[in-house]
């Protein structure tokens, strides 16, 4: 149970260390994370806070959501997410409170980043699963990109579940674990993590403290 933030992927750049080493980082904008609702054990059966992120006109959300934001006294957002917290931490928060980046995270901390991967549409097995293509010549006729056999004969007489075939590629939720925060820009509420994260620039991401930190090698 730890506090996370909703962010927007800005893009990638690089940072330089004092030794001159270039570090590729992804910039995440976590500004305007505001408390939209506080849930407690007494009223909801569990302890959590609901954060809103982004801005949206009240006329562009449903009446139910417009009332939900108005009750908390916050501007309508385009993203909502819950984070389970201890009752002691929730007691310190109030609806409408803005949570800055340095409150939730510190430089050098490991985090998990969840996002939706870039959709590639309907793709073949070569692009989707990195299958090898067929021969370009020497008797190969119109079978350059076919996947090959998809099963056996009359026994078992079916295609096994999970067989890798053509289909939709991308546009699924993925989480990258144990990314290190290289720097936090407190003035602009930006988090810079080492490496790449899922999604296209401008996409919604959720940043949470790492839950499965790897063991140190002896």
Swiss-Prot record:
Biological process annotations from GO: translation
N5-methylglutamine, modified sites: 154
Post-translational modification: Methylated by PrmB.
GO molecular function, one term: structural constituent of ribosome
Record's keyword terms, sorted: Methylation, Ribonucleoprotein, Ribosomal protein, RNA-binding, rRNA-binding
Matches recorded under InterPro entries: Ribosomal_uL3, Ribosomal_uL3_bac/org-type, Ribosomal_uL3_CS, Transl_B-barrel_sf
Gene3D superfamilies assigned: 3.30.160.810, Translation factors
One CC-aspect GO term: cytosolic large ribosomal subunit
Residues covered by region (Disordered): 134-154
One Pfam family linked to the record: Ribosomal_L3
Task performed by this protein: One of the primary rRNA binding proteins, it binds directly near the 3'-end of the 23S rRNA, where it nucleates assembly of the 50S subunit.
Quaternary context: Part of the 50S ribosomal subunit. Forms a cluster with proteins L14 and L19.
Family membership: Belongs to the universal ribosomal protein uL3 family.
PANTHER family reported for this sequence: 50S RIBOSOMAL PROTEIN L3 (PTHR11229), LARGE RIBOSOMAL SUBUNIT PROTEIN UL3C (PTHR11229:SF16)
Protein name, UniProt field: Large ribosomal subunit protein uL3
Organism: Polynucleobacter necessarius subsp. necessarius (strain STIR1)
Taxonomy of the source species: Bacteria, Pseudomonadati, Pseudomonadota, Betaproteobacteria, Burkholderiales
